[in-house]
């Protein structure tokens, strides 16, 4: 097992290689489904890199759908409802997230904590997913904070969408 290692990018396959109940704390800051394309700034070390935060069914690892259907039928029903009510892109996003959160539950110790960082785009869906995977009784709290941005615009500055959410189980 890796010790004191930080993994970036898609974590699904890394988690599948880990034993059950070995992790004390998980903090995740996943994509928010913002429907935007993010490009690294020109001149930065990451110049030329980009991240597409728009989700389709191509982003879902279909090999793990059978496990979800067998072990989390109410979660699958919820995901289907979101697709019917909202749209197929949100359905793809929350399926993608559910597959990873299921693995996180498996590797998290019984007395471990998980902090999910998100914004209002899908926080309400992610909270229900966490309830269905971890159980409603394991919900601890939500933490909200408003980020403060410094601007030279003085009183003309109007912050937008700076509230961040942490869902804790």
Feature annotation, model-predicted:
Residues 1-169:
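Core catalytic lobe of class I
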């Amino acid at each position: 097992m890796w010790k004191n290692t930080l993994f970036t990018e898609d974590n699904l396959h890394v988690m599948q290689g880990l034993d059950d109940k070995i992790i004390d704390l998980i903090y995740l800051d996943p994509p928010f489904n913002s429907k935007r394309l993010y490009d690294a700034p020109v001149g930065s070390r990451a110049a030329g890199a980009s991240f597409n935060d728009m989700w389709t069914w191509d982003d879902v690892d279909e090999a793990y759908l059978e496990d979800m259907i067998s072990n989390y039928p109410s979660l699958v029903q919820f995901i289907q409802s979101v697709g019917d009510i909202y749209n197929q892109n949100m359905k793809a996003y929350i399926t993608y997230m559910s597959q990873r959160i299921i693995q996180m539950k498996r590797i998290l110790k019984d007395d471990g904590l998980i902090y999910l960082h998100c914004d209002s785009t899908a926080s309400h869906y992610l909270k229900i997913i966490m309830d269905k995977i971890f159980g409603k009784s394991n919900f601890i709290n939500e933490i909200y904070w408003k980020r403060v941005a410094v601007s030279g615009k003085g009183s003309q500055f109007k912050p937008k969408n700076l509230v961040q959410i942490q869902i804790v189980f």
